[in-house]
């Protein structure tokens, strides 16, 4: 088997001409490991780490390493990272450290963070901190430094390094600071203080940043929820525009057994039927979790009526109909919306019907109707058809739908720049 980093990267990024990760997971759930094994050896990247992981669980680590070897030999970072993850899980951290160090020394832009975190997880946090310290001005590496500082016993040094950034005022975000602005620095400093048990200081830091930063507002809500600060969380949720604080409040109330309080928190976002679509989505999930499927359907039907063109809302509604064993009612609702929109549906909307058709009329009818759609032979339609077929246990057909008869030879994919190797 010959594989090429450029070809692998293109197919993995675009999910084109390959078996996607969702289908690989589905194949394994259904027990079709032989299909995953076969295609792992045929250049199907998403099959390879899944099969290698299974082999490792069966104490066949040498065989697992052989599965990944052709991909690893290309120098493709995704393969290096996957191999390091498996080696660490098998108790072979030294080998994992060695392969990530090689990519770091070669200058791969993602390798330093991965290598440092790997060191820290395996008793070498001091070394990781030292590696990261010169890169404090780079956001992802600063976050990694804060994370490894605790095990390195250098929390105060990390706090001092991050504090120096809290005075920065952006003049041309993100170019003036590469995304590492004052609010982000406050969030990182709050992470250190919370870890040290100085929760009130962490809250004060996030409050200072939350007036101008959505991220800090979300961090504040999550922090309050983690520490059970219910009344402060209520106050934060009352002025929350992103619904994130409301979600944290509802989650805390549900965790404490106050389901009605959690429902009320979502319903207060704009009115009795939760017209904010994100609050409605979370409310519907909450109701469904507690056996109130009809109420969940009512919530999402209101959303579908007012925002009929939003495919994620219709998809959520359709899944609720499926969960309630009412595929026919779901199709009737979609039919009514289609008529209101002129009777034509692009594939993104039409594909929502397929699981409902399959549940009511069988997978063959769903596939036939899908192929009759003007976009039914497209590559993106193939993903949906494959999911239907795999769900019915027809794995060979599912794979055949996805894979082109003649895959491009390594090195001949002309799309985009070559990945960093």
Describe each region flagged by the PLM:
Residues 1-64, 415:
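N-terminal alpha-helical scaffold/docking segments in eukaryotic complex subunits
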Residues 12, 23-24, 36, 52, ...:
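Conserved small-residue packing positions in alpha-helical repeats and bundles
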Residues 12-20, 42-49, 74-81, 106-113, ...:
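Generic helix N-cap/helix-start motif at coil->alpha-helix transitions
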Residues 27, 39, 55, 87, ...:
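Residue at a conserved register position within TPR or TPR-like alpha-solenoid repeats
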Residues 37-41, 69, 101, 133, ...:
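Alpha-solenoid helical repeat scaffolds
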């Amino acid at each position: 088997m010959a594989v090429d980093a450029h070809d692998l990267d293109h197919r993995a990024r675009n999910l084109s001409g390959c078996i996607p990760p969702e289908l690989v997971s589905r194949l394994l759930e259904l027990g079709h490991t032989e299909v995953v094994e076969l295609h792992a050896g045929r250049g199907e990247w998403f099959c390879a780490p899944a099969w290698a992981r299974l082999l490792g669980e069966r104490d066949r680590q040498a065989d697992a390493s052989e599965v990944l070897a052709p991909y690893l030999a290309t120098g493709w970072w995704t393969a290096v990272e996957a191999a390091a993850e498996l080696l660490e899980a098998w108790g072979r951290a030294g080998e994992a450290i060695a392969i990530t160090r090689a990519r770091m020394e070669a200058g791969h832009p993602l390798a330093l963070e991965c290598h440092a975190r790997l060191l820290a997880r395996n008793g070498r946090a001091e070394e990781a901190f030292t590696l990261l310290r010169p890169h404090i001005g780079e956001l992802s590496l600063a976050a990694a430094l804060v994370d490894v500082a605790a095990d390195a016993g250098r929390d105060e040094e990390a706090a001092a390094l991050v504090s120096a950034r809290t005075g920065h005022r952006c003049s041309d975000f993100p170019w003036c600071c590469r995304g590492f602005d004052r609010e982000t620095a406050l969030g990182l400093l709050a992470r250190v203080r919370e870890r040290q048990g100085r929760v009130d200081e962490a809250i004060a830091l996030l409050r200072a940043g939350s007036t101008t930063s959505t991220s800090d507002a979300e961090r504040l809500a999550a922090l309050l929820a983690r520490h059970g600060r219910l009344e402060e969380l209520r106050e934060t949720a009352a002025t929350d525009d992103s619904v994130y604080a409301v979600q944290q409040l509802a989650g805390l109330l549900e965790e404490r057994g106050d389901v009605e309080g959690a429902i009320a928190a979502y319903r207060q976002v704009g009115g009795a039927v939760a017209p904010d679509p994100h609050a409605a989505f979370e409310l519907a999930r909450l109701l469904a979790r507690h056996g109130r499927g009809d109420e969940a359907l009512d919530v999402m039907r209101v959303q579908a009526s007012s925002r009929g063109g939003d495919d994620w809302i219709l998809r959520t509604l359709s899944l609720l109909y499926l969960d309630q064993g009412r595929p026919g009612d779901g199709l009737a609702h979609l039919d009514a919306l289609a008529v209101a929109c002129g009777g034509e549906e692009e594939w993104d909307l039409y594909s929502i019907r397929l699981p409902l058709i399959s549940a009511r009329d069988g997978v063959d009818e769903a596939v036939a109707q899908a192929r009759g759609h003007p976009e039914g032979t497209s590559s993106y339609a193939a993903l949906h058809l494959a999911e239907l077929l795999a769900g019915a246990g027809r794995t060979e057909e599912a794979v055949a739908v996805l894979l082109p008869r003649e895959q491009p030879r390594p090195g001949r994919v002309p799309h985009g720049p070559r990945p960093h190797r």
